[in-house]
Amino acid sequence: MRKYMVYRTILFLIFSLPVTQVIAQENIPELNKRIIEYVESVIDKKVDRGECWDLAYQALNRFNAQWDGKFQYGKLINPKREPVLPGDIIQFKNVKIRYQITYTTYTEFMKQHTAIVYKVKGKNVFTIAHQNTEFSGRKVGLSDLNLAHVVKGDVKIYRPIPKSNK
């Protein structure tokens, strides 16, 4: 019975993610893996001043990533054309998110916010790590994000890239 349940769980996980996402999860760049390891080490802890940007700043600088030191965190990717991976960085600008749980509608606003993709749960559905939020304060916390719930604003996703050794 136990083997059957394990087999059933594996099948569910395989078929609940799009094929490209399953393949992508196996091909995570080394830099992204290191960023996720760092994020895991700081969950429920305050990073620097506790600003959302500080988490990405520390992760990118710690592993010598190439970025502009402001809001361009690597290579801009298009989630419609290429898979989003754990360790990718999301920049929100003037974003409004609206979603419903049972009979309650929730609305969230993000004037300027930075987060790191912690897990990919499905196409454009992620668990993100971020701080300076209502739910976790200035400590790093995890929450879910579904890009289909974004009704306004600009969401950019960046793939961290290593600095070239020139």
Residues covered by each model-derived region:
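Aromatic- and glycine-rich peptidoglycan recognition patches
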Residues: 26, 30, 108-166
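N-terminal capping segments
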Residues: 22-70, 74-75, 105-110
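...with weaker cross-activation on analogous glycine-rich loops/strands in unrelated enzymes
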Residues: 66-134
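Bacterial Sec-dependent N-terminal signal peptides
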Residues: 1-26
